[in-house]
Structures are given as C-alpha cells and as structure tokens.
Amino acid sequence: MHRKVRPASLMIRKMACSGVEPQILVQYLVLRKDLSQAPFSWPTGALVAQACHAATAALHLHRDHPHTAAYLRELGRMRKVVLEAADETTLKELAETLQQKNIDHTLWLEQPENIATCIALRPYPKEEVSQYLKKFRLFK
C-alpha cells in the first residue's frame, strides 16, 4: 500500500494558518574521509553507498521516533548534512560520545571486512546535536 505524499506547500500553509512554526529536522551523517585516499582509495560511488546504507539503517531503526516520523512525512523538505571524519579512530570516538550522550545513531560497518565507514544520526532538531558535531566540517 502506498501512502500519498502531500505537497509541502499545503502542509506549510496549514501550519502558517495555525500559527505553528514547522520544526526543522536534520539527519546528520559523518563519513570517513581517509577511505577516499591512499592506501584505501575507495571510489566516490562506494563512499556514497556507505552514507546511504547508514542513513537508511538509522531511519529504519528509529522509525517509531516522532522526529523520524515527522521527517519522513515531509519528503520534499528532508535535510541531510554530510560531514567528514578524518579516520576510523575519529569516527569511533564520535560514536562513543554519541552513545554516552544518548544520541540515537547508527555506526555503519561494511561487511564482510567489518570496517566502520559512517555514522548516521536519526533526524534531530539541529540545536539538539550541533554541539557534538561542530568540530567536523562538510565532506568534500
């Protein structure tokens, strides 16, 4: 069964009429930059696939959270930010920090090699998680 996706303009109009400002939700991903460089030299497509796997897994695992449900209801307004981690150690340290702070996330492990490649958070309001991500820059 397919769910009808309502145009974002209709939803925004309804919110404007009710005086409710829509909450902006962002899904953050942190992808290992070193995988694109020697000695790994993974192709761009392989890195994009890792980010896609992590994002999909995080959305699925946290599908019952109200933020995830709201994010998925507004397909035309989805926001993702892809940041870069220098290496595996940096990525795993971030995963540990997120775990300690109870920030819902998925650490994607490429199989069968068991290589940590990407972290995806479930959708969050930016202000709730920016303090944990501010040291990471946009992936280039």
UniProtKB/Swiss-Prot annotation:
Its recorded reaction(s) are:
an N-acyl-L-alpha-aminoacyl-tRNA + H2O = an N-acyl-L-amino acid + a tRNA + H(+)
Any single GO molecular-function term of the entry would be: peptidyl-tRNA hydrolase activity
What top-tier enzyme class does this entry carry? hydrolase
- Entry keyword annotation includes Hydrolase: yes
According to its UniProt record, the EC number is 3.1.1.29
User: Which Pfam families does its entry note?
Assistant: PTH2
Q: Which family does it belong to?
A: Belongs to the PTH2 family. PTRHD1 subfamily.
- Function recorded in the entry: As a putative peptidyl-tRNA hydrolase, it might be involved in releasing tRNAs from the ribosome during protein synthesis. Some evidence, however, suggests that it lacks peptidyl-tRNA hydrolase activity.
Protein name per its UniProtKB record? Putative peptidyl-tRNA hydrolase PTRHD1
Query: What species was this sequence derived from?
Result: Mus musculus
